Amino acid sequence: MTRPIQASLDLQALKQNLSIVRQAAPYARVWSVVKANAYGHGIERIWSALGATDGFALLNLEEAITLRERGWKGPILMLEGFFHAQDLEIYDQHRLTTCVHSNWQLKALQNARLKAPLDIYLKVNSGMNRLGFQPDRVLTVWQQLRAMANVGEMTLMSHFAEAEHPDGISSAMARIEQAAEGLECRRSLANSAATLWHQEAHFDWVRPGIILYGASPSGQWRDIANTGLRPVMTLSSEIIGVQTLKAGERVGYGGRYTARDEQRIGIVAAGYADGYPRHAPTGTPVLVDGVLTMTVGTVSMDMLAVDLTPCPQAGIGTPVELWGKEIKIDDVAAAAGTVGYELMCALALRVPVVTV
């Protein structure tokens, strides 16, 4: 028998989450963001469940080619654009829409020998200060691109640094309005948070990411608990060992947990080499045999310990949900001082994945 840990992906939940996105932004088209191997879910496993989307948005050329080879004929948006001028030949071959965010890309597009024009997303720096042109340069750059034979349809895009907060949206929107002055153009601005909470940012295309996979863009599950969004990934394992501690005995590396009274603990086949956060402290929520309990002690490479006091019936082989339908990944991430995005993307290759 194989080690009992596995991740299961609920494809019906993924479909439902896309439907909820459409309800939230009924007048916009949807770029389903599948970067980082579909946020750790596996782009080849899940893309067909998102087949009702209007387009896919990602970063890696290899993933874009995979979608084409799997039969996706719709739009694909490369969120960081092309990284080398020679990439444009492949973009042309596979009909990819590219972000343009830097001066060197303008020259590369001008000089490229393409069979047909490429659609362009011109990126505005609206305050994130990662990629994009400053608002006062956008009109000039737009006109340069518009004059190029290699450029097809154009859209203005940006990415919000603080879409969870009204002030963050308003300041970014002001910069975008400055950039768009004098332009009649399509826009794509809304990430997951703006899709859910800021209708004024929807415009022509929304770009949901984390909410497709059933986690909160704010990092707090309570913020999306009433939306109908459902977790797609469930990470589960089993108890493979049981220890009965005496009062004063300690658990795990460094002995960071001490039993106050006699206590049973379960040893679970899951650790940081599987993608469970090493920094998850004692008290991180976990479900044992359907009962809410908590981790105790330091997470090891391959194992972690849980308190069996609330579930005395538990023993060898008892199922454990580490995150998923009942234990929300946002709650585990918050306990560990990180975000659900990171936990999804950190799922280790050695963890078997099944779709349901």
Curated annotation (Swiss-Prot):
PROSITE patterns: ALANINE_RACEMASE. The keyword Ribonucleoprotein does not apply. Keywords: Isomerase, Pyridoxal phosphate. The active site is at residues 35, 253. GO terms for biological process: D-alanine biosynthetic process. NCBIfam families: alr (TIGR00492), PRK03646.1 (NF002970). Belongs to the alanine racemase family. This is Alanine racemase, catabolic. The gene is dadX.
